[in-house]
From Swiss-Prot:
PANTHER family: PURINE NUCLEOSIDE PHOSPHORYLASE DEOD-TYPE (PTHR43691:SF2), URIDINE PHOSPHORYLASE (PTHR43691)
Keyword Glycosyltransferase on entry: yes
Lineage, broadest ranks: Bacteria, Pseudomonadati, Pseudomonadota, Gammaproteobacteria, Enterobacterales
Alphabetized UniProt keyword annotations: Glycosyltransferase, Transferase
One Pfam family this sequence matches: PNP_UDP_1
PROSITE patterns in the cross-refs: PNP_UDP_1
Binding site for phosphate: G21, R25, R44, R88, V89, G90, S91
Protein name: Purine nucleoside phosphorylase DeoD-type
Family under the similarity heading: Belongs to the PNP/UDP phosphorylase family.
Length: 237
């Protein structure tokens, strides 16, 4: 049954959903990597699709920017459409000099300055972590493709334009591999409703060096990340 933000019916979504931030990126993933694709959502332009990858039913849908937005879509997919696994696929910024442009980062955990998980967890700190089997399957899928993926902590920020750049020094000291805006929220929703989640990011820019990937480079490295995510689903079956 349709929700306020998703105009689909039970069965329209697979039990596994890949979620980029950009709905147009979701469309690209569906058209490039899936077969027998059909659109299952268009509310507020947040496009969702379901198809098959090597015979396995998989869905892909955008989640927008930031923890509040992604939390809405993740919650509705889980509680109203029976989704059991969510894989966020997106970009991140690097703060450490040993993390390079175009690196693939598998988010084992996610720190955050958001209060959303504290609200969920009665004002206590919540350790926002990915599902171990999903982390392992993604790492194995990357290795099979010859990609040296990094595995570790992300930082999910509420602000894209941070007023306090000294926080990047703290992140580097604590070994944060990438800064993005959603992983901690998705992990929190997954924990609340007893399902599994993972975030895989590609480093699109380096906060220290101000390096940025070109549009063509982003497309190539993004495709590597999507293939890792899709192959990890097969490994998890």
């Amino acid at each position: 049954m349709a929700t306020p933000h998703i105009n689909a019916e039970m069965g329209d979504f697979a039990d596994v959903v890949l979620m980029p931030g950009d709905p147009l990126r979701a469309k690209h993933i569906a058209e490039t990597f899936l077969q027998d694709v059909r659109q299952v959502n268009n509310v507020r332009g947040m496009l969702g699709f379901t198809g098959t990858y090597k015979g396995r039913k998989i869905s892909v849908m955008g989640h927008g920017m930031g923890i509040p937005s992604c939390s809405i879509y993740a919650k509705e997919l889980i509680t109203d459409f029976g989704v059991k696994k969510i894989i966020r696929v997106g970009s991140c910024g690097a703060v450490s000099m040993d993390v390079k442009l175009r690196d693939v980062v598998i988010g084992m955990g996610a720190c955050t300055d958001s209060k959303v998980n504290r609200l969920r967890f009665k004002d206590n700190d919540f350790a926002a972590i990915a599902d171990f089997d999903m982390v392992r399957n993604a790492a194995d899928a990357a290795k099979a493709k010859g990609i040296d993926a990094r595995v570790g902590n992300l930082f999910s920020a509420d602000l894209f334009y941070s007023p306090d750049p000294t926080m990047f020094d703290v992140m580097e000291k604590y070994g944060i591999l990438g800064v993005e805006m959603e992983a901690a929220g998705i992990y929190g929703v997954a924990a609340e409703f007893g399902v599994k989640a993972l975030t895989i990011c590609t480093v699109s820019d380096h906060i220290r060096t101000h390096e940025q990937t070109t549009a063509a480079e982003r497309q190539t490295t993004f495709n590597d990340m999507i293939e890792i995510a899709l192959e990890s689903v097969l490994l998890g079956d």
